Amino acid sequence: MTDTTKIDYSKTLYLPQTEFPMRAGLPQREPLFVQRWEEMNLYKKLREQAKDRPLYVLHDGPPYANGNIHIGHALNKILKDVITRSFQMRGYNSNYVPGWDCHGLPIEWKIEEKYRAAGKNKDEVPINEFRKECREFASNWIKVQTEEFKRLAILGDFENPYTTMNFHAEARIAGELLKFAASGQLYRGSKPVMWSVVERTALAEAEVEYHDIESDMIWVKFPVAGEVATENDLSGSAVVIWTTTPWTIPGNRAVSYSSRIEYGLFEITEAENDFGPRPGERLVFADKLVEECCAKAKLQFKRLRSVSAEELGKIVLDHPLKGFGGGYEFVVPMLDGDHVTDDAGTGFVHTAPSHGREDFEAWMDNARQLEARGIDPNIPFPVGDDGFYTKDAPGFGPDREGGPARVIDDNGKKGDANKVVIEQLIAADKLFARGRLKHSYPHSWRSKKPVIFRNTPQWFVYMDKNLGDGTTLRSRALKAIDETRFVPAAGQTRLRSMIEGRPDWVLSRQRAWGVPICVFVDEEGNILQDDAVNKRIMDAFEKEGADAWFADGARERFLGARAGEGWTQVRDILDVWFDSGSTHTFTLEDRPDLKWPADVYLEGSDQHRGWFHSSLLESCGTRGRAPYNAVVTHGFTMDEHGKKMSKSLGNTVTPQDVIKESGADILRLWVMTTDYWEDQRLGKSIIQTNIDAYRKLRNTIRWMLGTLAHDEGENVAYADLPELERLMLHRLTELDELVRSGYDTFDFKRIARALVDFMNVELSAFYFDIRKDALYCDAPSSIRRKAALQTVREIFVRLTTWLAPMLPFTMEEAWLDRYPQSVSIHAEQFRPTPAEWRDDVLAEKWRKVRAVRRVVTGALELERADKRIGSSLEAAPVVYIADKSLSDSLEGLDFAEICITSGISVSDAAAPEGAFTLGDVKGVAVVPERAKGEKCARSWRYTTDVGADPEFPEVSARDAAALRELQALGKL
């Protein structure tokens, strides 16, 4: 080589080389992977690969087949996907069968909207034609949502999903109902249910949401019946109740009190209003509430005496509407009720068993005693399904001049019922006071209109009937809850409290699109128990679907020879929660690729009252235990300020928009870094935070790929590895334990945080930074370089597989860049970690080394900031260490290499005044000094041996030796 030959030293370095782009381009690149996975049928390949492994089953809670997916769907499906992928990569056959909930009111509502727009009347359309349109509507949205889920990288058996409208599913749902009928758990009763006048159907609690409304409130006088109270001064007095539903007064049958409350008899002394109580009237109130009530009515009063609970229990009252419309001539008993408080009102509760759950329960608890007292215990039906009063509300129903009054009209608007009832109470001199109140009130989640409680004939499942083995459905469900794992644990308490307090399960809906309550009954509501009839029903549903129940001639077809016996065919359909609660039967039990019970159910926290709840009841009622071993819940997604997302507020974030602008892996990273079991926040700034975190992660992966381009797969024996490499392998053992534990406990945030911190803090800012010199500049034969490549290789394989369930697109891209002949990273397993890699003693030593290093780097940062050095390689600091355990930790190490300086001196002398220190590292001080020698043109390190090799006068002896080796290999 001549003196005139100029070497381009950058071409002699092992610099990173990769086609893995720095800019991810996820919106454009991700669909290519979706297409690749589809073309290779990745899901099927994984099933074949894992066919001999133990099954792990997450049973998919079915989303509703109506509309595009929203951010809640994305959160839910991503969490499920991470679970199934992580178990697949840890040695399980982790199947995922997606499902859809297809029946129910929302779809009916959409078809009815279409009819209304076309001027068609739904009632004039044959029911099976209507059901056909509902089925087609659901099918279309299943196709749309399938593609949207695939775009999120959800991996599942989308070619063979389950749907609740599949003929086999409908047959199985019907079969589950017939099991309840056969065991005597199903009964026809009447009960106040939440009723949507607009939709003409009963609603489950899960279908109701609460909004503030302003209502009439009234205080009403119930006179003490004279013939009962002649022996004391309660004769001629009245008990006062308070209600925010004046329209329920015609349904009143009792007044409830509490034996825990102190009551008094009060006399009115002055009255300002022209209507209402007059001076001299005597009224009974709770002592705590009389002043507030009388102030509302502008009355002055005096207390006459106490009234005991025993006394209240003996009297009966006259109905305030007594005689109106020729009705209300019955007496109104006083009932002791646990639900009565003196927090508000009068201390007495107007009890209308037709219009309230607690009212109903209080009435039924006392039914036998009431009947013994000559009081009719039957519960009336004062309001019809159309919101009009019936004949059971004399004077307000069909007998009323001008027609019956109405509680709510077809548009969900308040009718005239409150007005006419209040007017009649005034006319009867039974109104104590009136006012307006803003309060929370139930509304249909679909129509957004108020609902009412009304007594209706419905089909129920008993919660407390003895099932023949000493258990009840409630006791079975509570036992199952205790045997189930909940994440978070608070979910167990929440579901338990709901089961403990819930009433009998209402199964019926008065709609068209659903699985029918396929039973026949006599006039008393007794169910026909006939195996041959049931078999004909099940066989027909299996072949034709539940439409068979509504076809012409269905009654005769199914009853066969018993058609002449007078059995009535029930036309109600099942609540959709019974549908979804039965999915475990036709998926987990019936599919050979699944198993019963499921390992886990995962849904939003609202499903404690929804799918978790109905699945638990259905399975406990028919199989005696829950259909799941674990229940995982997530919260709801709010905007970045913690407000509920709403189109009207313009603060919604759609998964489609995030994917289009940033990519699905960004959305998945957001899910993985949230406390998903709580309510999460999402908005532009939060998305940007995740984009920034993703870029750092991607650049770390990219650097490893570029570095590994020079990896020839050589391995250095563990015993020969430098300490720094052994430290990194030790960290992999710790992370391996954390990752596996995190996936087991569904603690994804812990995994994501740990891996991101490892990549940013321990790799990019520590290990990679230190080893760049060896990786780029060392000779091909260097053990140090080979050891570093081997370690980067081990880190890459583990990081990418650990992250693959979370970021499937990016990790697939990185894996195929490194291993282009591979099927997919998702066909890989988490690598086992050799036990010898664990070295806690070494880790403790390096904790001390890194503490000293932090003081050095802190001192050099100040030097850089003050422009005294440009690079740490220009420095050769002096480190003063007073703590012997810290100085001992540096023995045998090239501490200059670790600090990325060209030299370093360690002294046990006292540090000079002004030396740099860190408060949290005691006994260490640093005095920065410039490095001696010349700058190597190849490595940029300052050494005193630059030019030692005359053939390479610009470089250090180390670099000259590397160049000679490259030259010998023909690479220079």
Curated annotation (Swiss-Prot):
Q: Does the UniProt entry include the keyword Protease?
A: no
The UniProt entry annotates the motif 'HIGH' region at 63-73
- Which positions are annotated as binding ATP? K647
**GO terms (BP aspect):** isoleucyl-tRNA aminoacylation
Q: Which InterPro entries match?
A: aa-tRNA-synth_I_CS, aa-tRNA-synth_Ia, Anticodon_Ile_BEm, Ile-tRNA-ligase, Ile-tRNA-ligase_type1, Ile-tRNA_ligase, M/V/L/I-tRNA-synth_anticd-bd, Rossmann-like_a/b/a_fold
Q: Which GO terms describe its molecular function?
A: aminoacyl-tRNA deacylase activity; ATP binding; isoleucine-tRNA ligase activity; tRNA binding
GO CC terms on record?
A: cytosol
Q: Which reaction does it catalyse?
A: tRNA(Ile) + L-isoleucine + ATP = L-isoleucyl-tRNA(Ile) + AMP + diphosphate
Where the record places motif 'KMSKS' region is 644-648
According to the UniProt entry, what is the EC number of this protein? Answer: 6.1.1.5
> Any idea which UniProt keywords this protein has?
Aminoacyl-tRNA synthetase, ATP-binding, Cytoplasm, Ligase, Nucleotide-binding, Protein biosynthesis
> Signal peptide location in the record?
none
Q: Which residues bind L-isoleucyl-5'-AMP?
A: E603
The places in or outside the cell where this protein is found are: Cytoplasm
Q: Which family does it belong to?
A: Belongs to the class-I aminoacyl-tRNA synthetase family. IleS type 1 subfamily.
What HAMAP family would the database entry show? Ile_tRNA_synth_type1
Domain comment, in the record's words? Answer: IleRS has two distinct active sites: one for aminoacylation and one for editing. The misactivated valine is translocated from the active site to the editing site, which sterically excludes the correctly activated isoleucine. The single editing site contains two valyl binding pockets, one specific for each substrate (Val-AMP or Val-tRNA(Ile)).
Q: What does this protein do?
A: Catalyzes the attachment of isoleucine to tRNA(Ile). As IleRS can inadvertently accommodate and process structurally similar amino acids such as valine, to avoid such errors it has two additional distinct tRNA(Ile)-dependent editing activities. One activity is designated as 'pretransfer' editing and involves the hydrolysis of activated Val-AMP. The other activity is designated 'posttransfer' editing and involves deacylation of mischarged Val-tRNA(Ile).
Instruction: List the NCBIfam families hit by this protein, alphabetically.
Output: ileS (TIGR00392)
Quaternary structure and interacting proteins, as annotated: Monomer.
Protein name according to UniProt: Isoleucine--tRNA ligase
